[in-house]
Amino acid sequence: MLKEEDKIFTNLHGQQSHDLKSSKKRGDWENTKALLDKGRDFIVEEVKKSGLRGRGGAGFSTGMKWSFMPKNLEKSCYLVVNADESEPGTCKDRDILRFEPHKLIEGCLLASFAIGANNCYIYIRGEFYNEASNIQRALDEAYKEGLIGKNSCGSGFDCNIYLHRGAGAYICGEETALLESLEGKKGMPRLKPPFPAGFGLYGCPTTINNVESIAVVPTILRRGASWFAGIGKPNNTGTKIFCISGHVNKPCNVEEAMGISLKELIEKYAGGVRGGWDNLKAIIPGGSSVPLLPKSLCEVDMDFDSLRTAGSGLGTGGIIVMDQSTDIIYAIARLSKFYMHESCGQCTPCREGTGWMWRVMMRLVKGNVKKSEIDELLNVTKEIEGHTICALGDAAAWPIQGLIRHFRSEIEARIKSDSVV
């Protein structure tokens, strides 16, 4: 359990103002120049030592990602912050954007300095109007105080930060589709390689990081890598914002240590499952794109490695709780419709497969399938998984795989007759 003094996001629920004056009282922008004066290599190494892994879902080492950026280049390079939070069940970045904007902006400055980028773009979800307004106000305050812009914080480093609003496409949360959109093109993922660190925004070296990943950097540098590494579990260090929704008594966002048990998280902060723990049916532990877990596996630790071992994933940390009243087949069918709608259509397996899977899922809801079609559906998910340019195909396949793995008997019980055509 996380100690109160170890919390990074002390205004996560908007108890206080998000303006610059209040943010400074909470420790933001405290002696930022001294951190910049320590040099780029220090910042990158400190973030590496902290064990910070990307909070957007992939869980890749943030410091390692920064180290991939080429050094001593004459052409521009960029930092891009992915604030296009669109994953069903996930709203952690939204609260950072609303209530802790200066943590993000200070993190942008430090990360930009670390990778040698004089320009940073915050790409925010189009529907986040109020959040975008808060970020823009915070940027205006930071420019006015000389914290960013020319000679940021008096360090001699120039850092300009721009806010760019998306247009509501889920696919633009994929890093290369985001870059395409930022360039004014249709948001469609790029083939990799080349990777963004070599050929990113406008053909220049680019690092793309999640909002939460960037927002924790200033606190890590102030308190030290060993402090952050001492929270959580080995290889799964630090704090994480979890979003708890669904059939709980008190849906909430909460910052906790990595590795806390899923059951403890729900019972301590969300008031427990509606009707008690025995009324639990299943939980999606990391946003809609990861496989669900049945009640028997729901005391797992909430970290990258433990959830992977359990057959799911930490993803974004969006916890969706489903009690016994849930039509689990329809719940997953609804997610299938989402991924069908959000597919960009570039890759044939995803373009054709997501629609096919949704149609079969809707027949499963009504029980109008043959038992053999369950295996056929599972085979199609495996043909889509790993055969697309980006991970949206995987995201569409995994919820269905989790459903069949853990609730096959419920699917079979609903099938009306094997003679259905």
UniProtKB/Swiss-Prot annotation:
InterPro entries: ComplexI_51kDa_subunit (IPR050837), NADH-UbQ_OxRdtase_51kDa_CS (IPR001949), NADH-UbQ_OxRdtase_suF (IPR011537), Nuo51_FMN-bd (IPR011538), Nuo51_FMN-bd_sf (IPR037225), Nuop51_4Fe4S-bd (IPR019575), Nuop51_4Fe4S-bd_sf (IPR037207), SLBB_dom (IPR054765). NAD(+) binds at G54, R55, G56, G57, A58, G59, F60, S61, T62, G63. GO terms for molecular function: 4 iron, 4 sulfur cluster binding; FMN binding; metal ion binding; NAD binding; NADH dehydrogenase (ubiquinone) activity; quinone binding. Transmembrane segments: none annotated. The keyword Iron-sulfur applies. It catalyses: a quinone + NADH + 5 H(+)(in) = a quinol + NAD(+) + 4 H(+)(out). Its cofactor is FMN; [4Fe-4S] cluster. FMN binds at residues 166-213. Keywords: 4Fe-4S, Flavoprotein, FMN, Iron, Iron-sulfur, Metal-binding, NAD, Quinone, Translocase. Disulfide bonds: none annotated. Gene3D superfamilies: 3.10.20.600, NADH-ubiquinone oxidoreductase 51kDa subunit, NADH-ubiquinone oxidoreductase 51kDa subunit, iron-sulphur binding domain. [4Fe-4S] cluster binds at C344, C347, C350, C390. Its EC number is 7.1.1.-. Binds 1 FMN. SUPFAM superfamilies: Nqo1 FMN-binding domain-like, Nqo1 middle domain-like, Nqo1C-terminal domain-like. The keyword Transferase does not apply. NDH-1 shuttles electrons from NADH, via FMN and iron-sulfur (Fe-S) centers, to quinones in the respiratory chain. Couples the redox reaction to proton translocation (for every two electrons transferred, four hydrogen ions are translocated across the cytoplasmic membrane), and thus conserves the redox energy in a proton gradient. Belongs to the complex I 51 kDa subunit family. This is NADH-quinone oxidoreductase subunit F. The lineage of its organism: Bacteria, Pseudomonadati, Pseudomonadota, Alphaproteobacteria, Rickettsiales.
